[in-house]
Amino acid sequence: MGARNSVLRGKKADELEKVRLRPGGKKKYRLKHIVWAANELDKFGLAESLLESKEGCQKILRVLDPLVPTGSENLKSLFNTVCVIWCLHAEEKVKDTEEAKKLAQRHLVAETGTAEKMPNTSRPTAPPSGKRGNYPVQQAGGNYVHVPLSPRTLNAWVKLVEEKKFGAEVVPGFQALSEGCTPYDINQMLNCVGDHQAAMQIIREIINEEAADWDSQHPIPGPLPAGQLRDPRGSDIAGTTSTVDEQIQWMYRPQNPVPVGNIYRRWIQIGLQKCVRKYNPTNILDIKQGPKEPFQSYVDRFYKSLRAEQTDPAVKNWMTQTLLIQNANPDCKLVLKGLGMNPTLEEMLTACQGVGGPGQKARLMAEALKEAMGPSPIPFAAAQQRKAIRYWNCGKEGHSARQCRAPRRQGCWKCGKPGHIMANCPERQAGFFRVGPTGKEASQLPRDPSPSGADTNSTSGRSSSGTVGEIYAAREKAEGAEGETIQRGDGGLAAPRAERDTSQRGDRGLAAPQFSLWKRPVVTAYIEDQPVEVLLDTGADDSIVAGIELGDNYTPKIVGGIGGFINTKEYKNVEIKVLNKRVRATIMTGDTPINIFGRNILTALGMSLNLPVAKIEPIKVTLKPGKDGPRLKQWPLTKEKIEALKEICEKMEKEGQLEEAPPTNPYNTPTFAIKKKDKNKWRMLIDFRELNKVTQDFTEIQLGIPHPAGLAKKKRISILDVGDAYFSIPLHEDFRQYTAFTLPAVNNMEPGKRYIYKVLPQGWKGSPAIFQYTMRQVLEPFRKANPDVILIQYMDDILIASDRTGLEHDKVVLQLKELLNGLGFSTPDEKFQKDPPFQWMGCELWPTKWKLQKLQLPQKDIWTVNDIQKLVGVLNWAAQIYSGIKTKHLCRLIRGKMTLTEEVQWTELAEAELEENKIILSQEQEGYYYQEEKELEATIQKSQGHQWTYKIHQEEKILKVGKYAKIKNTHTNGVRLLAQVVQKIGKEALVIWGRIPKFHLPVERETWEQWWDNYWQVTWIPEWDFVSTPPLVRLTFNLVGDPIPGAETFYTDGSCNRQSKEGKAGYVTDRGKDKVKVLEQTTNQQAELEVFRMALADSGPKVNIIVDSQYVMGIVAGQPTESENRIVNQIIEEMIKKEAVYVAWVPAHKGIGGNQEVDHLVSQGIRQVLFLEKIEPAQEEHEKYHSIIKELTHKFGIPLLVARQIVNSCAQCQQKGEAIHGQVNAEIGVWQMDYTHLEGKIIIVAVHVASGFIEAEVIPQESGRQTALFLLKLASRWPITHLHTDNGPNFTSQEVKMVAWWVGIEQSFGVPYNPQSQGVVEAMNHHLKNQISRIREQANTIETIVLMAVHCMNFKRRGGIGDMTPAERLINMITTEQEIQFLQRKNSNFKNFQVYYREGRDQLWKGPGELLWKGEGAVIVKVGTDIKVVPRRKAKIIRDYGGRQELDSSPHLEGAREDGEMACPCQVPEIQNKRPRGGALCSPPQGGMGMVDLQQGNIPTTRKKSSRNTGILEPNTRKRMALLSCSKINLVYRKVLDRCYPRLCRHPNT
């Protein structure tokens, strides 16, 4: 600002204000034009300091002069302004701009010796030789040279796009910045725009269309002579197939130049215009002024939309003259029509100031009221005759402002002076000081007649004073919270801009200087470098100070105020510095009781009086889809609670937090009340559990509480509490209905009163998230305005810390309180903490330290599970600052499934641990605050019993401490636990301080690296240092990584029978020793551990042990130092004694074990594992060639697990992880289909998903018919049930759908180029093209080579599932599917049958067993886990009709024999085994066979009549019955049968 004020000083500034803007015009230059010119210079990379001298102006003119002929209006205005400033520096007297422009150009011509010529419009503009402007193509030595675009130009383009977001300003901005550019430069500009890819795509499409049109209009000519430059194609103009040199040659060749740069610019402009229309869809015909919208705001919207309209200037001019007036509101339209034909925009803005706004309405209302009922201020006014109404604008009588047709006069309606409107007229305000009539003539402008004849500027009462006061009061009442903006007096043109800037800065919160009114706004000002304390007074018209001397150049004035008149000296054009701004204004000096800056200086400073109106927008909340609100009944309440709830609800209703629910609201949630902590007041609670279930989900924005150790050290701390935090934030109006609740009445004396919440309710799941989000939005401006202040907010607690002085800190706190209070939040004084100690988050804060609030451990005689949980919680809370706290044995007291009220039995270890914790808590500990400049360190110590403690500190000051006692594994060691502790501390430090501390670990580096080399995958470990703090973490035994030469090798195995719990553990050695131990009540894992212990116990100091149990291998490899398992502890003791132990794992080697087969092999002395000798060659093979797993298993015959272990052990082949891929349907009938293109041909590709088999061929066109024919051909060759494609028009055509329907194919569609939808065929397209490229030279046509490539891919590509080719795999899958279906059909015939059988000479029937297979001579039966083969002659097959039931239900019945006969019940084993010795077999009765329908649970009584009158039942019933005729049947059966069928089952021996 200082540079701009120093451009013109003294007489030069006065001379500037005499120069007219146009010849014969009224307007003259002002200082604001210099400010504008200084701002514009920055766009051209020119310093504004050049305006301060004649030589600097000459440099500016040399740069701008070549650009003027093709420049924008802004550039021409800047050139004209610099010409005027140059003339003033050169002391050339000029009257207007044109005269100054001629003088400056004449000087430039004389200086350069020749005038610049206009460039030819048919080719791109370029600067003349020797001149270097902002042109990418310049002429040097007769040749055109390309100069890359400057970073300033590119930065200006990117900034333009980012700020305007493809608004209407982007197109002219691009025109200006791309002037003279080549296509290469334009592409460089487009590539700089990174985030607006949608708009860039639109531009690319326009470029492609225009390039195609260019190619069609400019066909390629015949062959060109050697050396002749070709004509540009569309892609050449776009810069994709041409070089920069070619582009320059086309642009500047002597004959037939082609301005490729300008052509490409036009294409880009078309694309930008399309983007502008897309991003600004409002049509200019829709831009209409609102009924209360200021005219200036309407004009801004109109011209913004006008810029986006891509029409010629004539149409835009018509729109400006016609639409601007036509779409104005009625009030402004009436004023604009009175201005006559074609008024200027400045005249329209001036005439419509204040029209239609609340201020004008209030003024008209006040005038009407005054004329209708207001008494005259003159005592004798009633005796005088009232004159007719005279309108001041035209001077005619008989009408008011609304009916006047004359053009409005410019200037103030009150005093007639230009430069301000009546709303800001100094004579209209009741100022504190007024200028007296000394030496001043009365204004000659027309005014309302003064009955008293007194001068209107005198201090006595004037006729309009009452009217003005009432109008001002009405305006104040109407405008309410609208801010009063004090405007300049320099022509009136800065006022609209000031108003607009004020409105635009409204969302910046506290970024601008503000003065709250809790005290008088007094600032220090420097008047001509003399410091003065002044009061900022918006009620005073003028400024007056005392005690300074400003010289003799003054005018005497008399001003009147509350205390009377005082004599003053008025000084004009005085330099004043206040609030880091410099202005020049008029000031008076005199004997005033207080120094005052009035509106004349406040306006120059750009200050305004604002009343912020706070409003928190509610966040929209909905229920989950398909859910409805709660409809629960209110449960009964006591009279005391009902009265308490009634009082609470009435208070909340008065405060606007509740409102009465309408009778149409169907929802309800139960409410109740509980006593607060003080037991005197009640708290209302709503049971929102049901509403929470159906409310949409929320995310907690603040995931944890802030820790005091993370606070930076500050001198001042204050803590605010937001009272009724939730109740200060509105609930969305559409959601309020679901919060309805009812207050019942005692004995139902009256209907219950129903309420709904208008604010966030307590207990509702959305309240915390919405409150956290809202508070963040509220406090964000404050944080930005006060970056040196730490503001920590957690729910309703706010901590403010700073290094400011006490007074400045209190100001910030008060400012925050006012901000919160203005938004409707309360900050209760009783909860405001100003002095330490501060109670915050369970801690006590001091300026230099923090500590926990006093902890009190509970004292109880009987402890329950809940009491222990609370005790452990208190101790864990204390562990953040009290080092040494342990809870391991306390937690063991409540291990297992226990109820909260169950009594706990204390152990001696737990009691000792509690007493130790009490001693630790008795010594008060303190923590310190974080200092960012110091290093953060963490020291870890190991306590007893695998418990760890750590402290995080800076130098010797401890920030916080902690403990760790979590053991994730039963068998572990100290190094693994140490890694877990470090990981916990690292995460904690990242959360609290955002950085990783430097660790001091109690472990030797050699010990750590020995373990870490093999177990680096365990976790992440940051930088650390060794610290000698006993007890050190050590590894207790020496595991080596390579086999020990010469040491005995033990091969171990163990097994166990799950039913009998008996097992065996045994080993063999390479030296012929073996040992087997029988175990009882064991498990497989215990047997494996036992044999490992046996091998250690029976071996020498060095040993190689081979195991087949990953369980054992995992325990031993972890090098545990302690375990809860007895055998593992014995293993640890044995391994400590060894010098070296090598342990290796091989999968499930046979020959050793505890089962029957392995025990037999051990007894025979077969000790070899057959594939062990091939492991070493396989490892060598992999080390040489890094073979894959499949190759190792195929070549060396080793198991897949061994091969995978070899590959995973290789550092080069080790994979840290794999990407997570999507899954596709791989059923046997699923195919995927897609199109691909190669050498201009269309190839249709179909892939069998499960096998990778491919079908492809070249088709003439990409249409639905061709696709349908190919699909029909494919379906005739292979079974296809499902076809998956993209959703292209050819695949969704009717032809393809018809073929799919006819063949019976299910279609599904995905998204094009989405790898998770049709990724198989997309990948196959790529492989097909690669295969074609390998064999392309073997055929001429693309049709042939495609079929050849398909053959290679189907029959020569082995691998994958089954190690087959895709063709073999597909045929195998189809064959397998057929076999499976056949076997399933066969097996389904046996699943409902059971088999009873005999074995050997045993005559007892056994079973039943499950029938697996029935052959010609035998059947296969499954009994339990055994599978038996039984001859047909010793087996009885019966049908199973269901499981065994009670006797009165359906028992198991016999099924039909194979030859159609029914099996006799006496042959059923369960019956036959109960037959008495020597009993005869049953025989059918003579009178016929009786059948019993036991499956249905009843015995039929109806029989079919026959000629013999026999009791034969229905034929259908016989299929479900069993023949009952035997000598001995259960008594229950006998009773039933004897009663219903007396002739059934009679036997001579019965």
From Swiss-Prot:
Residues 110-136, 437-508 are annotated as: Disordered. Residues 456-469 have a biased composition (Low complexity). A zinc finger (Integrase-type) spans 1173-1214. One of its GO terms (cellular component) is host cell. Residues 7-31 are annotated as: Interaction with Gp41. Residues 191-228 are annotated as: Interaction with human PPIA/CYPA and NUP153. The record marks 222-223 as: Cis/trans isomerization of proline peptide bond. Mg(2+) 3 binds at residues 1234, 1286, 1322. A motif (Nuclear export signal) lies at residues 16-22. Its cofactor is Mg(2+). This is Gag-Pol polyprotein. It comes from Human immunodeficiency virus type 2 subtype A (isolate BEN).
